[in-house]
């Protein structure tokens, strides 16, 4: 018996040991392939102007489309030398070369290899001497700098422009002095001379500080911040009159417990230089606090996120116990019951972080969070570090809460810059339960099979005005003809089911998309003969019927009113507002407004977003839970990254549409895109911005109009001097020489910019006649009359009134790049 007992004991011990070893081996297998994102490796390149470093350029591993990569603007003088400084970050640079292209990227004007780099203050410096005789004044060009590293080539992009009378150094030095002075109230008193405080700006919101904020708010109130990382100015726009610069930097502040808070700050400055000093025309600052759960962020009410924009993306699991949110480029998950905060994804490193890690040209979208805390999400934009460092694209990830690890499922690279990619993805990105991803990019709608690593194009060309998406991105619809007021057929898609349906207008009618109410499509019908376009280009689309219909074809609501037409419809999440008009002859006269309310019952949210005023930080954002938060100090975890066994890269080779578009840039960012140059000019005027066309030529600039000019009529094409009021006719007569700009609906003051840029403007006057504006001064316009061939002055006020009476019909052109 004793031997049997010993034998049983030995076998039991062996069994237990086997279980332990097996568990250890399995755990090793589960953790050996997990780690962190690899550190950033690529150098940073900057331009140098009069000893000041400007326009930091981050490296790309693939060549970008220069007409969709609008980086900083580097002014050059008549000598046409560009000084650059390379911050190598221990990388060995084997060679440096550069290439000058036209702004649309179609023609290479020059390429050279730089044989000599000099070392200075930790930088490698070089001088690029641009020699191409094809470069013209006042025209942007793309400069691509190529560094050859041991790991392969890396590309850097900036824009260059040759203009006279610029005050670049004065603007740069003003910005550097202004933001530094803001950190020290003792030296900030003279800043009061530059700002314009009034009641339009909040004095307690550090996420939205403007030129109209108080001096106390501009100098950070009671926050008492310290500089962590200084900023390098980025020149966005500059001309003989004004300059616009953005600046990104980091500050820190001590909380009441002595903990250190970190803030990402973005400044925008628009300036004009007079003979005496720099004048500040506009100033905006946004500070965003980096979330740090070690700073006692949880209290009885909820989770204090600190100084952050109210446009915060967050989503909960079904029971609302777990909330996921994106803050300053970091993705976090907070579990109330487990009192646990997990950093799911971040390019920012906890220690030894530098400007490459904190590059803000990326964003995230949370797709879903399940009950256990597992999460699907998308990271899109420039990849600061990791396996796709230096690439722009869309990465789909899955987070496992049990393993506390993320796994990349697919990466779709793009040659569009972050701001263009974001514009598309903000409109639509959706991943179904069947692992089908639908996204809008480059003006096309794609379906990607994540498991099969394959894709197909659902719709080859999409006009923004003809494409609508439901609030949860699960449905979308577009018109067949891609004409918002001239389409007869609509296609709607259910992304979860990957099914489409078609809606057709009856013969003699047009169909118009209005949007979505919940997941129901809202659209209307109008008789083709009733659709009108006035002299200002404004379209009247009088609908007799408006329908609200789900994907299965069930009409939830059909609205029509006898003898009245719906001439305008405004749709929000909760309300469809319709303006009803009566037809009198060929015009429609407004009668009344009627509304259709969203009858979907509001779901009571268990997690809500609120703002709270604090003495030191001003307005802060808090996520409030329905249940009281019991533990103020959550456990803090950081998710690991699963190593990829195979490269999950799906290169779709997206080529943007060649259709003409007009881009409005304002306050340092891409503000909007229009198909109409007139609409773009009006928007840029309101936003104090600029307009560029598809080829990145300046169509219009706010504040860069000469005080007077007189064009040489001998240099004006005869097709323009004939003063046709038909855009089509003028384009046919100009041929490939130029592209016509229909500026109907703009003000006279706006279109005089075209004259200032040596582009005459055809203007309508009463009686169906027209004139050509060939010059102006402070008091008059100079107009050419095609009927008698004479040129005469016309008072500015008389000109304004005459053109307004004729409907402000203006037509100009811009020479095509050769």
Predicted regions and their residues:
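Beta-propeller blade signature
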Residues: 390-404, 490-497, 538-553, 597-598
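Beta-propeller fold detector
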Residues: 110-112, 283, 341-350, 405-414, ...
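Core segments of small alpha/beta cavity-forming domains
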Residues: 39-99, 104-108, 140-223, 297-340, ...
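N-terminal Sec-pathway targeting helices
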Residues: 1-16
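Conserved active-site-adjacent core of cysteine acyl-enzyme catalytic domains
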Residues: 710-818
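Conserved blade-ending motifs and adjacent loop-strand segments that build the rim/top face
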Residues: 464, 501-513, 554-572
């Amino acid at each position: 018996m004793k031997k049997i007992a010993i034998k049983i004991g030995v076998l039991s011990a062996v069994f237990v040991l086997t279980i332990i070893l097996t568990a250890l081996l399995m755990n090793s297998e589960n953790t050996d392939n997990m780690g962190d994102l690899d550190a950033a490796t690529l150098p940073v390149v900057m331009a140098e102007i009069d000893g000041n470093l400007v326009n930091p350029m981050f490296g790309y591993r693939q060549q970008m489309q220069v007409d969709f990569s609008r980086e900083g603007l580097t002014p050059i003088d008549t000598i046409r030398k560009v000084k650059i400084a390379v911050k190598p970050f221990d990388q060995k640079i084997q060679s440096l070369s550069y290439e000058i292209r036209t702004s649309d990227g179609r023609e290479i004007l020059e390429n050279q290899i730089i044989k000599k780099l000099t070392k200075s203050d930790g930088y490698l410096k070089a001088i690029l001497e641009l020699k191409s005789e094809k470069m013209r004044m006042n025209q942007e060009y793309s400069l691509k700098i190529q560094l050859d590293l041991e790991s392969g080539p890396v590309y850097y992009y900036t824009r260059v422009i040759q203009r006279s009378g610029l005050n670049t150094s004065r603007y740069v030095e003003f910005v550097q002095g202004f933001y530094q002075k803001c950190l020290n109230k003792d030296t900030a008193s003279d800043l009061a001379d530059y700002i314009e405080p009034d009641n339009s700006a909040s004095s307690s919101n550090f996420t939205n500080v403007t030129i109209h904020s108080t001096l106390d708010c501009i100098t950070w109130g009671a926050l008492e911040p310290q500089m962590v990382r200084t900023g390098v100015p980025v020149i966005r726009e500059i001309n003989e009159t004004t300059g616009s610069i953005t600046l990104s930097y980091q500050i820190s502040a001590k909380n009441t417990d002595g903990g250190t808070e970190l803030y990402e700050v973005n400044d925008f400055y628009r300036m004009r230089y007079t003979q005496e000093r720099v004048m500040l025309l506009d100033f905006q600052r946004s500070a965003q606090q980096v979330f740090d759960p070690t700073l006692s962020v949880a209290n009885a009410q909820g989770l204090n996120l600190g100084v952050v924009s109210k446009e915060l993306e967050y989503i909960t699991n079904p029971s609302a116990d777990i909330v996921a949110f994106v803050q300053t480029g970091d993705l976090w998950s907070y579990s109330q019951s487990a009192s646990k905060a997990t950093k799911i994804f971040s390019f920012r490193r906890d220690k030894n972080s530098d400007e490459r890690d904190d590059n803000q040209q990326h964003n995230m979208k949370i797709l879903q969070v399940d009950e256990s805390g597992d999460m699907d999400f998308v990271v899109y934009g420039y990849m600061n570090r990791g396996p796709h460092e230096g690439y722009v694209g869309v990465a789909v990830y899955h987070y496992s809460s049990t393993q506390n690890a993320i796994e990349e499922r697919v990466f779709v690279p793009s040659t569009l810059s972050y701001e263009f990619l974001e514009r598309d993805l903000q409109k639509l990105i959706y991943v179904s339960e069947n692992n089908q991803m639908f996204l809008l990019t480059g003006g096309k709608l794609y379906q990607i099979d994540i498991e099969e690593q394959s894709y197909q194009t659902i719709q080859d060309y999409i006009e923004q005005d003809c494409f609508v998406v439901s609030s949860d991105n699960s449905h979308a619809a577009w018109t067949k003809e891609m004409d918002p007021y001239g389409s007869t057929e609509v296609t709607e898609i259910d992304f979860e089911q990957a099914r489409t349906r078609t809606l057709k207008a009856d013969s003699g009618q047009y169909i118009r998309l209005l949007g979505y109410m919940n997941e129901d499509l809202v659209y209307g019908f109008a008789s083709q003969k009733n659709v009108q376009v006035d002299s200002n280009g404004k379209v009247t689309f009088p609908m007799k019927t408006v329908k609200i219909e789900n994907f299965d074809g069930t009409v939830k609501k059909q609205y029509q009113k006898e003898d009245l037409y719906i001439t305008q419809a405004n749709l929000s999440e909760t309300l469809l507002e319709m303006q009803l008009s009566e037809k009198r002859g060929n015009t429609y006269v407004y009668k009344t407004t009627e509304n259709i309310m969203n009858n979907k019952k509001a779901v009571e949210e268990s997690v809500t977003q609120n703002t709270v005023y604090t003495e030191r930080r001003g307005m802060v954002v808090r996520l409030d839970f329905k249940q009281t938060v019991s533990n103020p100090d959550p456990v803090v975890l950081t998710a690991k990254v699963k190593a990829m066994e195979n490269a999950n890269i799906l290169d779709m080779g997206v080529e943007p549409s060649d259709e003409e578009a007009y881009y409005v840039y304002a306050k340092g960012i891409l503000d909007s895109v229009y198909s109409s140059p007139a609409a773009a000019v009006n928007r840029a005027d309101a936003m104090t911005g600029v307009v560029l066309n598809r080829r990145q030529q300046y169509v219009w600039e706010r504040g860069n109009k000469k005080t007077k000019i007189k064009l040489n009529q001998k240099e004006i094409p005869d097709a323009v001097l004939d003063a046709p009021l038909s855009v089509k006719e003028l384009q046919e007569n100009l041929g490939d020489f130029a592209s016509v700009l229909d500026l109907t609906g703009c003000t006279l003051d706006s279109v005089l910019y075209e004259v200032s840029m040596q582009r005459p403007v055809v203007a309508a006057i009463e009686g169906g006649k027209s004139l050509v504006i060939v010059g102006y001064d402070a008091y008059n316009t100079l107009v050419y009359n095609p009927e008698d061939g004479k040129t005469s002055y016309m008072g500015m006020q008389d000109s304004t009134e005459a053109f307004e009476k004729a409907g402000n019909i203006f037509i100009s052109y811009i020479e095509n790049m050769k």
